[in-house]
Amino acid sequence: MQVRGSDDTLEFADKFRNYSKEDGHAYKKMNNKKFVLRRKSKLYCPNCKTKNNLNSIYCKECGTLLEDISKRTYDFSISNILSNISLKDSFKVAGFATLILFAISIVLKLILRVSLGNYVSYISTFDLLLLINGGNLNILTNANSMMNYGNYYNFAFQICSLALLVLPVICMVVSYNIFMKQKNTDELTLVRQAIGVGVIYGIILTVLALVSRNSLSIGGGYLSSGYSLVYGVSFLSVLVRGILLGFLSILYIGTKKEYIQNNMYLGIFKQVVNTVFLGYFIVFVLLVLGYFIGLSYVYEFGISGSISNINIFVVISQLAAYIWGFANLNPVTIGNQNLFLTNIFSTSLSIDFKLCLIAFIALSALILLISGIKLNNKYKTHAKKTTLIFSGFYAILMGVLAVFTCVNVNGGSLLGYNVQMNMSIIFTLIISFIYSFIVTFIGFKLNNWD
């Protein structure tokens, strides 16, 4: 029988030591947030049934331990979430983000004065702030003259630019880091923060939309024409988009690494956001390169007259969203072109750009396949459950993208033309869910093959 020496014994003991004998730090890191001490019974000892104080750890009669270590669980019921939302902190974050955006709107108004001159005085700072958040501008005009009295014309301008939406997101990030980041202690708290900030931000924008409606009279006099204008941003449009902006921004930036490890839903949500952003960014870069090498796709959609005074990068950033939507097999309207997989070769687009669109479809399939492989690496089992959750989040995010990228200029009978660039929200939700589920599920299963 071999007897261990003293050195061997110490080396053997060090392998199973929990704490360092030099400075006392723990060798094995345990995630204590996964566990919590809970009372076995609120008042009575489980052993002798003696009534104890709520603060007691041991039974006063028999000494039985009244607490037990159990896995931490969260109550994500709607009533529990809504009843514990901190309205004060939510208002701080949403209000300060609005103040930052108001200052940015003042700067933008000064920049617009260079190109628009005195006409910029008709645009209030609040209007700019609401338009940055994707608000719809409605204009009602009444034309009066000696020969023509009381003719009403209605204009609707719905222009949501992704390039401008970056500004409120940045303001939300800054405000959140100042007022709320330190209080983000667990997944349930994060969901409450996101809902609270989203709702308060939407309400603030709604109030601004209701108080910022303007009226304007132009011209008039004997034998001359006069126009009266009533214009303002639709409160319903900024309410919906404000809630979505606040909720999604806080939920994404507040998701920590440990939340991704502990909560499958938050982990998949963050992966979906990264997947959509990656696809959009690649399409944007490729469209920019295509523009500089001479592809005339911007003019093939019949919108060149409407965008002649807009920076080309802003236009491409908008087109990239529609092309990414088409790459996910969604029907898309861009100017005079209605794009869908079945009619792509019957459109008037050049053959080069048609082939590019087919390549974008292949790109989206590749990205979703890789996402399926990543899901398999993180969650080895429950293929259908994880891919269903992924596809649900993916469809919702694509639907949100459709909401924030809608462009609809309705000139009415006075101007006589309309400009539309959008994705159908309903079709986008349905098709994106089915398409992403099929491709992601294939990627999940492919990773199981040896």
Please annotate each region the language model reported.
Residues F102-I106, L110, V114, V169-V173, ...:
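Transmembrane alpha-helical segments of multi-pass membrane transport proteins and ion-pumping complexes
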Residues K181-I260, S296-S306, N377-D450:
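Alpha-helical transmembrane segments of multi-pass integral membrane proteins
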Residues V315-L319, A327-N330, N343-T381, T387-F390, ...:
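Hydrophobic multi-pass inner-membrane translocation pores used for secretion
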Residues R38-K42, K51-G95, I253-V272, S304-I307:
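N-terminal juxtamembrane cytosolic/stromal segments of multi-pass membrane proteins
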